[in-house]
Amino acid sequence: MQFAIYAAAALFEIAGCFAFWAWLKLDKSPLWLAPGMVCLALFAYLLTLIESNVAGRAYAAYGGIYIIASILWIWFAEGARPDRWDVVGACTAFAGTCIILFAPRS
């Protein structure tokens, strides 16, 4: 369940940020900002659902999921194929996420 929350949070964060990107960089209508802000609020809410005793750990673990989701966004939403360094970087970040999520805690 935690992974699904992280994945949904990443989707909402990327979509929200992309709405601002589209408005400022792609000359889209300011109307893009309304759904962008809703997406960013949903992103923040979803991260509060993560089971963690400290917020920073939840955010740190989320970082690797966000990077992978961003690489997928490049490919599927923007139509650009990630290069090998994108993939290597995403895999490295995901390894860090796994360490944070699954390390034994006292």
From Swiss-Prot:
Q: Which InterPro entries match?
A: UPF0060 (IPR003844)
Entry-linked SUPFAM superfamilies: Multidrug resistance efflux transporter EmrE
Please tell me where this protein is predominantly located.
membrane
- What does the UniProt keyword field contain? Cell inner membrane, Cell membrane, Membrane, Transmembrane, Transmembrane helix
How does this protein sit in the membrane? Multi-pass membrane protein
- Intracellular or extracellular location(s): Cell inner membrane
Q: Which GO terms describe its cellular component?
A: plasma membrane
Pfam family example for this protein? UPF0060
Q: Which residues cross the membrane?
A: 3-23, 30-50, 60-80, 84-104
Record's keyword annotation contains Repeat = no
Listed HAMAP family:
UPF0060
Which protein family is it in? Belongs to the UPF0060 family.
Name-wise, this protein is UPF0060 membrane protein Oant_2511
